[in-house]
Amino acid sequence: FQAEDGIRDRSPSRGLGDVYKRQIAYFLKGIVSFQNRNTIYDFNEKPNQGIRGARNWIKSHLDKWSDQPGADLFSCEFEFDYLMCNRTRHSQLLSIIPGHGPLRKELVILEAHLDSRCESLCDTICLAEGADDNGSGSALLMEISRNLCLFSLSRTIVILWVTGEEQGLGGSRSFATFCKQNAIPIKAVFNNDIVGGIECGKTSSPPSCPGPYQYDSTRLRLFSSGVTNSMSKNLARLSKLIIDDASKDSSFHLPQIDVMFGEDRSGRGSDHIPFRELGYSAVRFTSSYEHGDGNPNQPDYTDRQHSSRDILGQDINGDGILDSFYVDFNYLRNNTLVNAISAVNAASSTFDPYKLQLIPDVNSLVVKIENPQNALEYIIGIRKINSAYFDTIIFSKFPEITINDLNASTYYVTAAGRDSNGWIGMFGQEYNARILSNTNNLSFASPVELLQNRPNPFDELTLIPIIINDPQFVKNAQLEIYTESGHPIKFIKLDLKTGLNEILYDYQWNNYN
């Protein structure tokens, strides 16, 4: 592969190797060549066909890389029982890059589902290349394995080619359950599902794209659960911070990371969710634009997602060689680097989450880190209640700072530390402080506060915050939502607790009769 096709991260604190567009293209072409990778197209007597053939082909590359001088990588298969398409026994492939030192038993997981599907969920005969969904994520994992096998990291990296995503997340749920039952600590989970396409379809699951023949190769969506005091959301915020930071110091073009409010697109899901359900920090990367909403049974569905049309590309001039691709290899290469940087940071940072003391005053706030751990730099993230990402980020050499000229509001504050190698620890608990504009504001707060929803306007989810200052005033609570004309949309029974309560409103509730 020619050197000009590679990208080298020149940031000395990262030390990441080359990520090659041509290498990724080769991997993706190999994966789609198996034509149908349905979860149940997996037979001992057909080792070179279906999803078993794809697993064996990937493993042959892992074995080759593990034989390199200085490489530290081994692969294995995880067998599990989970009923999918009338079959119970399944298998999925892992590559493992062992950690070194006292944190080596903690895992950082990179995952992507290898299985594909066409219009029929359990069809093993149809053409189901699954080029973007999810050959793109599977090829991304191969390139990361090739690069990181020469790294020596504090935590162990597990790279998981999941099976059964299309049939209900069976593979990821089984592996997450295995980790939980065996008390295996997991620092972070990075899921990649549909990460190579840049074209919007006629349909797409919101929040997504404006319509057909629209393209975006500059942004990457990052989904995670929760908003306030969510470790998954904090992992998403940290990933954006790291990528924004790397973009300033690098000659290559990383995508802009959009931290989304929801855990996934409306009505959709993927393999990060079972890990989050069991208490692990887990996020999902997915393309800014998608070609389809994954529902091929609807009338006049012509998009590629979940259909036999999810192919690598077209031969326009009839010479037998694809020359128009539905997966953008530059975009997929950049998304591969996003994952490599995020995963290596998670596997390298050693700081414990910070505990904070907040001292509010009139138009000001003192933030004190109680366990600073001698960081080279302290990073304080501040946001208002309605923001998914930080509104303000402060970089300081000192573990105690005073922030002046604040508007009267409630602020949520968290912090992380950067070590001498540039790695950043996980953001810890969010602490809140109410800032007053003058001493006349010291009157008692209302027992219940219903705050403005954000984002507003919205096209998918919006967050409705409710603050309970005095729980004795609340017995039975219900949130009632109406149209401007008074038509009822949704009544939601609320179980409110003292402090902040967050309700995510789904745009689909507007589809009343």
Segment roles from a protein language model:
Residues A3-Y20, G417:
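Short, small-residue-biased leader/transition segments that mark boundaries at the very start
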Residues S420-N438:
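Extracellular fibronectin type III
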Residues V32, V195-Q214, M260-T350:
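Active-site-adjacent mobile loop/cap segments within catalytic or ligand-binding domains
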Residues V366-K368, N440-T483, F491-L494, L500-N510:
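Glycine-centered coil/turn sites that cap beta-strands in beta-rich domains
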Residues V162-L278, A282:
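Metal-dependent peptidase/peptidase-like ectodomains
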Residues Y26-P98:
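A non-catalytic alpha/beta surface segment that caps or lines the substrate-entry region
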Residues I403-I424:
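Beta-strand-rich modules
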Residues L110, D115-S116, L121-L169, N339:
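Alpha-helical metal-binding/catalytic segments enriched in His/Glu/Asp
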